[in-house]
Amino acid sequence: MVSLPPPQSDVTLPGPTRLEGERQGDLMQAPGLPGSPAPQSKHAGFSCSSFVSDGPPERTPSLPPHSPRIASPGPEQVQGHCPAGPGPGPFRLSPSDKYPGFGFEEAAASSPGRFLKGSHAPFHPYKRPFHEDVFPEAETTLALKGHSFKTPGPLEAFEEIPVDVAEAEAFLPGFSAEAWCNGLPYPSQEHGPQVLGSEVKVKPPVLESGAGMFCYQPPLQHMYCSSQPPFHQYSPGGGSYPIPYLGSSHYQYQRMAPQASTDGHQPLFPKPIYSYSILIFMALKNSKTGSLPVSEIYNFMTEHFPYFKTAPDGWKNSVRHNLSLNKCFEKVENKSGSSSRKGCLWALNPAKIDKMQEELQKWKRKDPIAVRKSMAKPEELDSLIGDKREKLGSPLLGCPPPGLSGSGPIRPLAPPAGLSPPLHSLHPAPGPIPGKNPLQDLLMGHTPSCYGQTYLHLSPGLAPPGPPQPLFPQPDGHLELRAQPGTPQDSPLPAHTPPSHSAKLLAEPSPARTMHDTLLPDGDLGTDLDAINPSLTDFDFQGNLWEQLKDDSLALDPLVLVTSSPTSSSMPPPQPPPHCFPPGPCLTETGSGAGDLAAPGSGGSGALGDLHLTTLYSAFMELEPTPPTAPAGPSVYLSPSSKPVALA
């Protein structure tokens, strides 16, 4: 037999198990081919021997599974001469017992029974042998893949685990393996009190050099003991375990920072309540030349309303749509000489400035707090909006002529220039008290010099806290005009309310109340479509819609202020105005037929007890019957167009 290198054949039995005839067994193996069977030894009892190298005899931890140079004794010989009990050193089962056809040097091939599974001495792959009757399942385990346990790396790592576990448990008194595996990487409030109430030393010095710590998985050691200094944060109450900042870049998804909620910070400035058309109007109105390119409009919006600094880019598309589709803006020629489309300027349409200014004031009145919150410099709001009375028309109602206080039929006031149809107003009739103003109670003692400029401003601060007081005392079923306190006059009305019936009877006591304030309700008239779709904001048809609504509010048929019954919805043809005198009752028109007159309280179908006020501000004023014993008061007319109707 050809001798082999020493490193490949160094597996022998330990010293005490080495027998005296072992040297002779080695010498009796004559040289021959590697695949030829070795002759049987004369000493059958010394068959546990194997190849011996020239070096010192020592045992190695494991061998390759397909080594062709190792001779192993038969199971029956090992049973007889190598006891199964504990000895000075464990005996390892050679893989030649399971792989006989790979050139192993064994005894004669005439004894195949040695390789059967029915042997009486199964061996553990790397521990001492066990008997079949004690561990019957050991045979099946060895027959599957015994070589999987014979590599040096896994064996050494596996045998070192109990030592590290014992040391780790000394520093983790209240934690189990499940708590370490499931608790710390994903902290939550659902852990038991044992985990939450323990003081834990996350990185003890002994565990820093361990190889297989925490759940016995060496790759997980970076989750708890990183090479960088730990940055632990403890809660003030001390009732929870620390949450580590992990230094390894391989576990970015496991970083649990307590202030993680502040990373997605809320925007400091909310979205402004102004529509894009109003924001463009503000930018153009506050420009030096009155015209700006699109880029300057963007800069104005981001400077004064920081919301647009972080808003999606879709808001720029909305700005461009408003500029091109809204008639309030027009493209002007760039006088600097640039004729490209990018250099064009945008300016305000002079015919639409009044409408845009009123729209701007309306939004300021609607929610001034929200407007200022969305601005970078809230103190600049008034300067950006500008003077309300700038370039606006004259007040709606002028002062009555001096001769109006004399006796004679009531004449409607002359409308302002540019308004063809007569406007409806509230006029005092000639009464027995020449110096008495019938609206004095309404104005709480303030005697106005011009009815068209002074009105009552219904606000919670000015309105009396008690029940509404009668404005015009009426006798015998006559009607009582009441104003409901506590309802602010500036509150927006529903957007579907028709603006054509907007004969405003109440207004604030300031001459700044202008034509647009009186004619137009405070509700949204459809000029702002941002709530529907930003891409559909302020299209071309809105300019015509505004003009149509404004014309409808001025050019109407005679406004129906009084209807006698639900079945009659229109007034008869104009009749000569009746004249009432204090001694007798006033004759009032009824809906039974044209020209029919009936005394109040006569019991007809058109009695004044059924009268209703059908104006836009029916929410502010209503007519109710009063007891017949009420004292008589001055006569006041509500005059639709040229036909006054006597109420008292």
Curated annotation (Swiss-Prot):
Region (Disordered): 1-105, 392-445, 458-508, 623-648
Locations listed in the record: Nucleus
Annotation: DNA-binding region: 271-367
Effect after changing L325P: In TLIND; uncertain significance
Chain intervals with Pro residues compositional bias: 58-67, 462-473
Cited SUPFAM superfamilies: Winged helix' DNA-binding domain
Task performed by this protein: Transcriptional regulator which regulates the development, differentiation, and function of thymic epithelial cells (TECs) both in the prenatal and postnatal thymus. Acts as a master regulator of the TECs lineage development and is required from the onset of differentiation in progenitor TECs in the developing fetus to the final differentiation steps through which TECs mature to acquire their full functionality.
GO molecular function: DNA-binding transcription activator activity, RNA polymerase II-specific; DNA-binding transcription factor activity, RNA polymerase II-specific; transcription cis-regulatory region binding
Native organism: Homo sapiens (Human)
GO cellular component terms given for this protein: chromatin; nucleus
Effect caused by changing P242S: Does not affect transcriptional activity as shown by a transcriptional reporter assay
Disease / disorder: T-cell immunodeficiency, congenital alopecia, and nail dystrophy: A disorder characterized by the association of congenital alopecia, severe T-cell immunodeficiency, and ridging and pitting of all nails.
Keyword annotations of the record: Developmental protein, Differentiation, Disease variant, DNA-binding, Hypotrichosis, Nucleus, Transcription, Transcription regulation
Pfam families to which the protein is assigned, alphabetical: Forkhead (PF00250)
Tissue specificity as recorded in UniProt: Expressed in thymus.
GO biological process, one term: animal organ morphogenesis
Name of the protein: Forkhead box protein N1
Domain of life per record: Eukaryota
